Amino acid sequence: MRICCRIYNNKTMRIQYNNIIKAAAAVIAVAGSTACSDTWDDHYAAADNTANGTVWEALQADNSLTNFTRVVKACNYDLVLSGSQTLSVFAPTDNALGQAEADELISQYETEKRNGVKDDDNKVLKQFIKNHISLYTHPVSSLSDDSITMMNGKYTVLTSSTIGGKALKQTNQLKSNGMLFTVEGQIPYYPNVYEYTGQDSELDSVYNFLSKYNEYVFDASQSVPGNIIDGKTHYLDSVTVLNNPLFSTIGFINREDSAYWMLAPTNSEWNRLTKEYDNYFIYDKSVSNRDSMQYTNSRMALVGGGIFNVNDNQGILGIDTLYSTLASPRSLKSYIDIIDYNYYTYANPFAAGGIFEGTEDIELSNGHVRKAHDYRISKYQTFAQSSFVSAAMTQYQDTILNAEDPLTLRTVVSTNPFYNKINSNVFAEIVPENSGVNPQVTFKLPNLLSNMGYDIYAVFVPAIAYDTYATDEQRLPCRFISYLTYNDLNGKPVTSRLTGTFETQPDVVDSVLLASNYKFPTCTYNTDNYVKLRIQSAVGNSQTSKYSRTMRIAGFYIRPHKQ
């Protein structure tokens, strides 16, 4: 059996949304539709006169369907076709399905059964048997041109003379439990984006990762009921629906009623990048499930940036800016331009140097896969993000020593020249508890990666940002030292003083670089652990006329270092 898909190179890339996707919204309306013309009434009435026997009995009695009948029997689907559930069966004739191919399908089915493959994943059931059967009756007339849902969830176009582009030979053979059609061809099976990654030998690393989180949930509405025994319905065909928690985050690339593009790295690129990304998610030994967290987070860091919802991107073709499913509507920016990124957002994706350059395009049932032998999405565009930690937010204040507690919060009013030059126009004022001490405050820095070089800035604010009449003493610069505390691999806290004593500039918003390309041995991403940053005033008693012991801090910028 052949799996059909279309491949184009980047230069000749084109998209043709076939009728399978275009007509998806009409599927439900098709089921159980009633007559609307005299011709249709006559046709349906004629079919009704033949309603004797089951679909399975009709298959057995038709000498032109022997090979399809053998495959159905070998896969135990004769029980389904002789049951009470109403079905439409589109059976390929022996001219369309030869004896050798039928034998091959039976052998493949039996091999997968022996290997413990679930029926939901059995390729013969999913891609062949269920691809030729639909729930409910779907009689055709001269007016027919609709899309129906097959038992595998695929949408297939049914016209008066074709199904999935293959010619109908006999139509509307009404039986006691449905309808039989004979087809001069096999209905093409088009994989969706998720399925294709498992069928392409160069992409199966992506599939193997995603499929680890597959769960199947029983769906009674799609299952074929049998007898009721001891008050419980026994199902001839139990249909389960794929439920993967990762899809709720990155996009439902497995759904036929959705449209997605996926930039998928080949196995060689996958291996190269996951080897690198694993180093960014090393958790200390105190973190539960640290190995599984490292595995999942490093691979989600790779997969998450390359999936795109067609509806959110104006059809994608010709678009200037492409947003992945993880893109945020907000971008993190600052007045000093330390941070100015739109994460998971890519400019000119089809242009030279764009993320789709050099990729292969594969058109699928619910979108496209762009196969990337050179994965062009940078970690700095996705998970290696700059962040701002506000000193004014109490959840990031760890300990306060020799200072008034709680810290005083100051707001920059709209008439002040510093308005909108400070994140959220609010900052913390750290006032010594008496004139003879140097205050210190330790702040929490969340969600940092291991072995990722960071540039760390402290943003100091002048007194005139909230009081334009501040005295000369209040406007003095600050002098301070700083420490970082983090866990080593064994979960033991390690404290390190940052090099030097820092001084701020007066009467300006001063972003002081505390550390450049600083790397932590452990990761705190998605945990309750924090890196801790202590800011401690360092003004001697003889220096109080030159420096202020009161420190005003808006917060801290943590930016991945770029060489």
Model-derived features: where do they sit?
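Sec-dependent bacterial lipoprotein signal peptides
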Residues: 1-36
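Mature, structured domains of secreted/extracytosolic soluble proteins
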Residues: 15, 32, 36-563
